[in-house]
Structure formats: C-alpha cells, structure tokens
C-alpha cells in the first residue's frame, strides 16, 4: 500500500525543444487526442539511415551486462521519426510501437547522458512491445550527453532544468513533439534515486500507485516543481499542452560510476544489473496492465 508524499531531493530531471512540428505531418480525424493515429510518415527532413541509430556511449561499457540505448532487439518499430537535432547535430529519434489508435504513452528513455539504468526499461519495451496501447519511445533525448558520458548536453545545459526557457534544441524538439502527439501519459526515466513520482492528474497518480505497489515501494511521491527559471521537463510540457500527465521513474543505478556529476548523491541507490533488469520488466508489465483500463 502506498501513500503520496512530496518529492524527495532530486539528482535532476529536465528537457529541451526545437521547432520541428512542421517537419512531421499527422492526419487528424478527431479532436480527441486518444483517437488520433500517431504520425506514421517520417520527418520531411532528409536524414541518413545511420542517423536513426542511437550512438554508442558510456552506458554501453559501464559494467558487465550494461547496455546503451540502441535497439538490441530483433523487433522493429512501426515507424521512426526524427523529432529534432541535438546541440551537437545528432538526430533525436522517436520510435512508435504498438497500437496506432487508442491510448498513447510517450516514454523518454534518457535525459541525462550519464544515467544508464533507464536503458534496461527501453530494452524491455522493445523486446516486448505493448499490445493494448501505442508507445512513442524516445531512446535518448540527449544523444550528445550519451556519447560523451555527461549529464548535460553539448553546451552544458541540464535538460531537466530547461523547462521554462526551453533554450536547448533537445528541449524544443520534445515540446514540439508533445504538441504533435498529445500523449495520454508521459514517462520520464532517470537514475539512481529509486523512487516513483507523478505529476498532474488522476491517471498519472493511478499508474504511479500501481508501479509503487508492483515494485514493493512504500511511497508515491509528487514529482514536484522547481522555481520557474529552472523548471523541470514536466512543467515545461504542461505549459505547452495544459493538463499533460506524467510519471517520473527514478531507477537504482547499475554502477557507482553512474551519474557522477549529479547535484545530490546523498540518496543514491546502488543495485546490480540483474536486479535492475527485474525492475525494468516490472515497469513494462505494470504499464501494460494500467493502460488496458483505458482501452
């Protein structure tokens, strides 16, 4: 059984956006975002096939059994779109899996480039794609940080403190994509604090409570708000599309090398690759069960 509490001190979580809405077209058949098919045509921006692959980074080699954010599964997404470019001109991609109609969930796999445990959830979602809802998966919002093994993007911006100014191209891309697909729920993945938070609505609170129960935790936190000048990603997303609901999943880390530059390491939770893999599997299964109720 879980109770709701204010968010504990954060290691950090944010995002950034580029004006990309004009580069992806979406057929609108209803005013209800849930019933609108997601974009199934690629961005009109010309990209090479190699830009649709997440670059190898620190997370690929952190420890035995660790992995990066590239697709290791034999499964292929329904579509892949480029939602923008990073500060270092790397493509930021979004993969669509599962249903094209009905509930749509947006999962942001990595925001800080030195947080590697979220790759296990990304891998789990690809290995066992959803059957009863649509999934938009952004493997990493911060390909520069992933490549460099840094918390920030190529210009030193912490994307999860960019919710107000939305100055980074990565944040701009995410916000434009949020406007475009209007997800029913957004899931942000982080490490290494090992807790669950929710923001802005009954669906998010319900899914958060189910995750807390399934993971054997005691408390569901509210994700909280930073002062406007350092607004979190979910605050920026809510400003772009009012009423957007989100879940923050802070995973335990797979290594003490993970998130070395985090603002506050006093609450770090260290685990093993095996246990983080189980955590990721539970996240995938809980999302699947929760979204069945929205069909």
Predicted ranges, named:
Residues 79, 85-87, 101-228, 241-244, ...:
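Active-site/substrate-binding loop(s) of hydrolase catalytic cores
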Residues 259-295:
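His/Asp/Glu-rich mid-to-C-terminal helical/loop segments that flank catalytic regions of hydrolases
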Residues 93-102:
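Short beta-strand-to-loop junctions in surface cap/lid or active-site-entrance loops
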């Amino acid at each position: 059984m879980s109770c709701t509490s204010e968010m504990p001190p954060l290691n950090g979580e944010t995002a950034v956006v580029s004006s990309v809405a004009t580069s992806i077209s979406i057929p609108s058949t209803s005013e209800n975002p849930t019933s609108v098919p997601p974009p199934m045509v690629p961005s009109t921006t010309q990209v090479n096939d190699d830009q649709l692959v997440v670059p190898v980074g620190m997370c690929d080699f952190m420890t035995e059994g660790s992995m990066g954010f590239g697709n290791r599964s034999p499964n292929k997404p329904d579509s892949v779109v480029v939602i923008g470019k990073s500060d270092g001109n790397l493509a930021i991609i979004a993969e669509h899996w599962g249903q094209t109609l009905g509930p749509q969930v947006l999962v942001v796999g990595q925001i800080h480039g030195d947080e590697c445990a979220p790759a296990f959830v990304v891998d789990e979602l690809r290995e066992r794609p959803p059957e009863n809802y649509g999934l938009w998966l952004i493997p990493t919002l911060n390909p520069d940080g992933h490549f460099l093994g840094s918390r920030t993007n190529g210009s030193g911006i912490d994307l999860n403190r960019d919710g107000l100014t939305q100055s980074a191209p990565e944040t701009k891309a995410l916000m434009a994509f949020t406007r475009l697909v209007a997800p029913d729920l957004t899931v942000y993945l982080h490490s290494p604090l090992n807790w669950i938070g929710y923001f802005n609505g009954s669906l998010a609170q319900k899914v958060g409570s189910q995750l807390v129960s399934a993971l054997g935790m005691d408390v569901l936190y509210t994700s909280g708000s930073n002062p406007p000048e350092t607004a979190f990603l979910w605050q920026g997303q809510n400003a772009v599309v009012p009423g957007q609901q989100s879940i923050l999943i802070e995973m335990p880390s797979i290594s003490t090398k993970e998130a070395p530059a985090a603002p506050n390491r006093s609450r770090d939770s260290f685990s093993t690759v095996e246990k983080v893999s189980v955590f990721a599997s539970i996240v995938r299964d809980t999302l699947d069960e929760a979204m069945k109720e929205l069909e």
